[in-house]
Amino acid sequence: RKESLRLYFRRFTRIRVICEVGTFSPWVKPLLESLGHEVLVANPRKLRALYASGHKSDRIDARMLARVGRMDPALLGPIHHRSLATQADLAVLRARALLVRARTKLVNHVRGAVKSMGARLRTCSTPRVHQLPLEEFPEALRPALAPLLTALASITAQIQECDRKIAELCRDRYIETALPMQVHGVGPVTALCFVLTLETPERFKKSRMVGAYLGLTPRQHSSGERDPQLPITKAGDRMLRTLLIQCAHYILGPFGQDSDLRRFGKRMLQRGGKTGKKKAVTAVARKLAVLLHRLWFAGEEYEPLRSTRKQERALQPCA
């Protein structure tokens, strides 16, 4: 409990406290820091000796963390926890994502049930499935699907309410989201998630570091002359990574605006291959993350064809 921790750690002068990341670490860290202590939250992905040990207990884990922390704290891969206010705002985005997944499952079930009866629903967007007249569904399925359509209507209304809250947060509290939204295909949800996940652009010395932070760079396991191609690490925030992938699909799709990002992705698509499209989408998502951080950090105006125009000017003959 908070009060018990506060009473216990008040007895010490400034000390280094090392804890493992978990459900409680987001509030334990600021609590102990408020008492003047140095708090490091260990990243389990960086401590294989800890979670892959054959002899594992709380006491053994604590001893291992203490030894590593005394030797070199950087080996812990310390995790940066967001502020409580940022976590509360991120909860709105996570609630929306959960509602969207629930709606998708319900819609897929409804469409699948109708197809199994030899019928087919008319084409409509996912948010409008609940608006279809009940008479368009097979009569035998109407008693089973009616409550699902009611649930879909309620979920869609809740998603719209979340969208209103997100738009309000972008407008009133996080005006810096206007910088990422300059990019065609990046909306309020992605922009707010990007700003809240990174929290401050100064955390990264170089914009290129953002791609690795979000798990959009390939894993590496080279040895000697052997350097196999591996999938991306998928480290970092899964929700933001998913949103960036969705934005990349839009940028490369039929409605994407002509830009350096789109041209880069199209060149990768031309290479072909079984995984050509996946690689192109991932590469565009990675470049998009770098671009969004640069726009946010520098406060620059977005130029869709900036690199292309630079190359054209460089090729022009000198007067």
Language-model region placement:
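A detector of single, family-specific signature residues
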Residues: 1-319
